[in-house]
A protein has these predicted regions:
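N-terminal glycine-/charge-rich "phosphate-binding" loop or analogous flexible N-terminal tail
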Residues: 8, 17-21, 25-30, 35-94, ...
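Cysteine-centered motifs
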Residues: 13-14
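C-terminal helix-to-coil terminal segments
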Residues: 43-48, 55, 63-66, 139, ...
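Phosphate-coordination loops involved in phosphoryl transfer and adenosine-cofactor binding
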Residues: 48, 184-187, 264
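Rossmann-like adenosine-cofactor binding region
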Residues: 92-95, 104-109, 218-306
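Phosphate/diphosphate ligand-binding glycine-rich loop within oxidoreductases
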Residues: 94-175
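Glycine-rich NAD(P)-binding loop of Rossmann-like domains
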Residues: 170-202
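NAD(P)-binding Rossmann-fold cofactor-contacting core
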Residues: 206-223
Length: 348
C-alpha cells in the first residue's frame, strides 16, 4: 500500500511538473507570437503606403534605395511637371510627398490628394509665406511639412568667390575695371546675414575685403569680427560689390535702390530667384555700363529670358549649390526628416 501510494504520488508530481512545463512553453510561445505581431504592426504603422518624389529632388541613389525600406510603394520622377493637373496625377493617393523648390504645391493640390500626411521639402524652408508649398494650409490639415537646411552653402560660397575673381582679374571674357584688381581692400556689402550670407562674409574677409552687412536684425557676433552694419541705403551707396543672400521671394531692390548704387558696381545674387524688380535691374544695367549682375541658374529663376542676353549679365547656367557633397547632405537630411516624422522623436 505504501509502495502504491509512493508511485501514485510520484505520478501526480510528474503530471503537475509536465503541466507546469507545458504551460510555460505555451506562455513563452504566446509571448513570442504577440511580440512578433505587435512588432510587425508597429512596422506597418511606421511605413508609408506610397511615397512619391513628384519632381527632381536631387536625392542620390542610396537615398532612393532607403525610401524602399520605409514605403510600400515608391515612385520617383526626375523632371519637373509644368501643369498642376500633372502634379495631381503624379501624387495620386500617396501619403508621403517629396518635392523640390520648383514645383508649386497649392491648396488645390492638397484638395485633390487627401491622403498626404507628410511633405518632405528637399530644399530649404525659410518661411511658410515664401515657400512653393502652401505650408500654412497643409499644417491646418494636420500635414507635417519639413524642409532641409545647410546643405548647399559651401558650393554657393565657392561660386561667389570664383566668379568675382574671374571678373575682377579678367580671367573670363570681361574685366570689371580697366586694370586687374584683387578682392583685397574692396568694400563688399552683404544683404542678408544668414547662413549663406555669413559664410560669404567670412570668405570675403579671408581675401582681405572690407565687409559690410545689412540685415533685419543686428548681428553682434558678426560685428565683433569686424563685419560692419550699415542701413540699406548706406550699404548700397558705399559698397562696390553687393551680394544678396535672401530667402525666396524677397524683392528688396527697385529703382530707388539701384539709383543709390550708381555705376561701377557688381551685384551678386545667391538667393532662389530674383531679389529685385526686373525692369529696375535692366534700367540700371543699361545706364551703368561698367556694372555687372552675377548669378547662377537658381538666382536667375523665372527671369532668365528677360536678362540672359544683356551683355553685363554674367549668367552661369548651373546650380552652384549642387555638388557630390551637397547632394549627400541633402539626401541624408531629407531621410532624417522622414524618420523623425515616422518615429515622432524630436530631431536633435
Amino acid at each position: 500500500m505504501k509502495a502504491f501510494l509512493g508511485v501514485e504520488f510520484q505520478l501526480v508530481c510528474c503530471a503537475y511538473f509536465l503541466s507546469y512545463k507545458t504551460l510555460r512553453i505555451f506562455l513563452a510561445a504566446l509571448s513570442g507570437f504577440m511580440y512578433f505581431r505587435m512588432n510587425n504592426l508597429h512596422k506597418e504603422d511606421m511605413n508609408f503606403k506610397k511615397i512619391v518624389a513628384v519632381d527632381e529632388t536631387l536625392l542620390n541613389e542610396a537615398a532612393l534605395e532607403q525610401l524602399k525600406t520605409i514605403g510600400e510603394e515608391v515612385v520617383v520622377y526626375h523632371d519637373f511637371p509644368t501643369e498642376e493637373e500633372e502634379v495631381i496625377r503624379r501624387i495620386g493617393n500617396a501619403d508621403c510627398l517629396l518635392v523640390s523648390f520648383r514645383t508649386p504645391i497649392r491648396r488645390s493640390v492638397l484638395d485633390a490628394c487627401p491622403n498626404i500626411r507628410y511633405i518632405g521639402m528637399c530644399c530649404t524652408l525659410y518661411y511658410p509665406e515664401s515657400s512653393n508649398v502652401d505650408v500654412i494650409e497643409a499644417r491646418k490639415r494636420g500635414i507635417t511639412v519639413l524642409g532641409v537646411k545647410d546643405y548647399g552653402d559651401e558650393g554657393v560660397v565657392e561660386y561667389v568667390v570664383s566668379e568675382l575673381v574671374r571678373l575682377l582679374h579678367g580671367f573670363g571674357n570681361v574685366r570689371w575695371l580697366e586694370e586687374s584688381t584683387e578682392l583685397t581692400g574692396r568694400k563688399v556689402g552683404i544683404i542678408g546675414l544668414g547662413k549663406t550670407g555669413g559664410m560669404v562674409a567670412e570668405a570675403m574677409r579671408f581675401f582681405g575685403a572690407e565687409v559690410l552687412y545689412y540685415s533685419r536684425t543686428r548681428k553682434p557676433e558678426a560685428e565683433a569680427k569686424g563685419i560692419a552694419y550699415r542701413p540699406l541705403a548706406d550699404l548700397l551707396t558705399e559698397a562696390e560689390i553687393i551680394c544678396t543672400c535672401l530667402p525666396r521671394n524677397n524683392y528688396l531692390l527697385g529703382e530707388p535702390e539701384f539709383a543709390l548704387m550708381g555705376d561701377r558696381k557688381i551685384l551678386v545674387n545667391t538667393s532662389v530667384g530674383p531679389t529685385f524688380e526686373v525692369d529696375a535691374l535692366k534700367k540700371w544695367l543699361g545706364t551703368c555700363k561698367h556694372s555687372y549682375y552675377l548669378c547662377d541658374a537658381t538666382g536667375m529663376g523665372v527671369v532668365r529670358d528677360a536678362l540672359k542676353d544683356i551683355p553685363n549679365v554674367l549668367y552661369t547656367p548651373y546650380i552652384s549649390g549642387k555638388s557630390i557633397q551637397s547632394v549627400e547632405r541633402l539626401s541624408q537630411k531629407a531621410l532624417a526628416n522622414i524618420r523623425t516624422f515616422l518615429s515622432e522623436v524630436p530631431q536633435v
